[in-house]
Amino acid sequence: MAENDAKPTLPKKSGPYISSVTSHGMNLVIRGIVLFFIGVFLALVLNLLQIQRNVTLFPPDVITSIFSSAWWVPPCCGTASAVIGLLYPCMDRHLGEPHKFKREWSSVMRCVAVFVGINHASAKVDFANNIQLSLTLAALSIGLWWTFDRSRSGFGLGVGIAFLATLVSQLLVYNGVYQYTSPDFLYVRSWLPCIFFAGGITMGNIGRQLAMYECKVIAEKSHED
């Protein structure tokens, strides 16, 4: 009996620690892949909406032919979506401000629907001038942030994403890498930043929701310890 009581106990923390690191890395990869395909899908859907006004971010035949001159645009949108979706929850943790506003999938789906609606409005509704279009889309985009986000980090990242994405797209156009199908370039520039801002908020909400599973696992392990 004494010998049995004297048996050394195995450390219990090494296993969960390794499991936690492994699950974190795997969770990160899975979230990135999911966000990538969501971004590609939304890029194709939004391009179909813009075709109604003959203003597209890439030629329409990119959907039917992988050998299109702008075949790389949807994968770039997917990559950007993955980066944005992973960046939002990372920024929340870094700032110590966990996002708790409307954290459920139904809210995320409504956010996606509103984002698609904003894009549809830019393609379908006829505005008197480009300034009216810009102000309307800006109000709708800020309304999307206020309704589904309301975080300072979300707003700041959205503005930064809109500025950077608009700058990159304009540089690509000026250098002839690709061009818009619409001759009215001022019209495109009037709605592009608002769409990028709303898209950043939308992908950020999706990324935050996907990250909730990992947060729940970490919380459960901390309670067990």
Curated annotation (Swiss-Prot):
Subunit structure of this chain's protein: Interacts with SCAP; interaction is direct and only takes place in the presence of sterols; it prevents interaction between SCAP and the coat protein complex II (COPII). Associates with the SCAP-SREBP complex; association is mediated via its interaction with SCAP and only takes place in the presence of sterols.
Keyword Lipid metabolism among UniProt keywords: yes
Motif placement: KxHxx: 219-225
Cell compartments where the protein resides: Endoplasmic reticulum membrane
Domains (record comment): Binds oxysterols in a pocket within their transmembrane domains and interacts with SCAP via transmembrane domains 3 and 4.
Protein name: Insulin-induced gene 2 protein
Species of provenance: Gallus gallus
Side Cytoplasmic, residues: 1-28, 89-103, 149-153, 208-225
Keywords: Cholesterol metabolism, Endoplasmic reticulum, Lipid metabolism, Lipid-binding, Membrane, Steroid metabolism, Sterol metabolism, Transmembrane, Transmembrane helix
Gene Ontology biological-process annotations: cellular response to insulin stimulus; cholesterol biosynthetic process; SREBP signaling pathway; SREBP-SCAP complex retention in endoplasmic reticulum
Side of membrane Lumenal, spans: 52-70, 127-129, 176-189
Gene encoding the protein: INSIG2
Main location as per UniProt: endoplasmic reticulum
PANTHER family registered for this protein in UniProt: INSULIN-INDUCED GENE 1, INSULIN-INDUCED GENE 2 PROTEIN
Record's function text: Oxysterol-binding protein that mediates feedback control of cholesterol synthesis by controlling both endoplasmic reticulum to Golgi transport of SCAP and degradation of HMGCR. Acts as a negative regulator of cholesterol biosynthesis by mediating the retention of the SCAP-SREBP complex in the endoplasmic reticulum, thereby blocking the processing of sterol regulatory element-binding proteins (SREBPs).
Annotated site, Required for the recognition of 25-hydroxycholesterol, chain positions: 115
